[in-house]
C-alpha cells in the first residue's frame, strides 16, 4: 500500500480522547491528520514533550521523525473530531494548491476507465461535455496550471476546487456517493 511521508495536523488533543474506549490511549496525547500524498486520514502519537499545532505539517515517513512518535493507523471519517472536520476542507485545499503540478498533470493525462466512463468524469462538475473539451484542449497543448485550464476552458472556473470536492467526497464515508 502507498505510504504517506508527511501529514497535516487537523486536530491535536493534548489529553487524548476524553471518552475513549481505547483505554490504552486514554489520557495520552493524540493527533488527527491528513497525509499530503494520498489524503489518508491518520491518527498520530506525538513524541513526549512535543506540542503540535493545527495545520502543522509533520514528517511521518520511515526515517527519523522529530515530532511524531508513532503512526497509529488510518482513521475513519466518522471518527474525526469536530475540529478535524472543520480543518479538513482547508487542509485539502492547501495540499491541492501546494501540489498544483501533480493535479494539473491529472487533467493532462487522465484516460478512460471503461468505454462508458472517463477518469475526468469522476470529478464533480465534469460530465461528458467538459470531459471532451478538456481532452481536445490538452491535445493542442498540455495544461500548465489551474489558471491555464480556466483560461482555455472558461466553463471550468475553478479546477482546484473541483479536485478538493472530489477528495472530500471520497473521504466522507457518512454520505452516500
Regions found by a protein language model. Give the residues of each.
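Small-residue hinge/turn detector
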Residues: 127-128
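Exposed beta-sheet edge/beta-hairpin loop segments within beta-rich domains
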Residues: 123-124, 140
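Structure-specific DNA junction-binding interface
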Residues: 1-97
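Intrinsically disordered, low-complexity regions
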Residues: 5-10, 123, 132, 153, ...
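Long, highly charged, low-complexity intrinsically disordered interaction regions
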Residues: 56-122, 155, 162-177
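Compact, charge-rich alpha-helical regulatory domains located at protein termini
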Residues: 118, 140, 144-162
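Short alpha-helical segments in extracytoplasmic peptidoglycan/chitin-binding modules
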Residues: 133-135, 149
Amino acid at each position: 500500500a502507498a505510504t504517506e511521508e508527511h501529514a497535516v495536523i487537523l486536530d491535536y488533543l493534548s489529553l487524548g480522547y476524553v471518552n475513549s474506549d481505547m483505554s490504552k490511549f486514554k489520557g495520552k496525547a493524540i493527533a488527527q491528520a491528513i497525509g499530503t500524498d494520498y489524503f489518508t486520514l491518520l491518527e498520530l502519537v506525538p513524541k513526549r514533550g512535543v506540542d503540535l499545532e493545527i495545520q502543522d505539517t509533520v514528517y511521518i515517513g520511515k526515517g527519523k521523525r522529530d515530532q511524531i512518535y508513532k503512526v497509529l493507523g488510518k482513521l475513519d471519517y466518522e471518527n474525526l473530531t469536530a475540529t478535524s472536520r472543520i480543518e479538513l476542507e482547508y487542509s485539502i485545499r492547501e495540499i491541492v494548491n501546494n501540489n498544483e503540478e501533480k493535479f494539473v498533470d491529472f487533467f493532462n493525462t487522465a484516460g478512460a476507465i471503461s468505454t462508458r466512463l472517463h477518469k475526468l468524469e469522476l470529478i464533480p462538475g465534469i460530465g461528458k461535455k467538459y470531459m471532451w473539451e478538456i481532452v481536445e484542449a490538452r491535445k493542442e497543448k498540455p495544461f500548465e496550471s489551474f489558471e491555464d485550464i480556466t483560461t482555455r476552458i472558461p466553463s471550468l472556473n475553478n479546477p482546484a476546487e473541483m479536485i478538493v470536492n472530489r477528495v472530500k467526497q471520497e473521504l466522507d464515508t457518512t454520505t452516500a456517493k
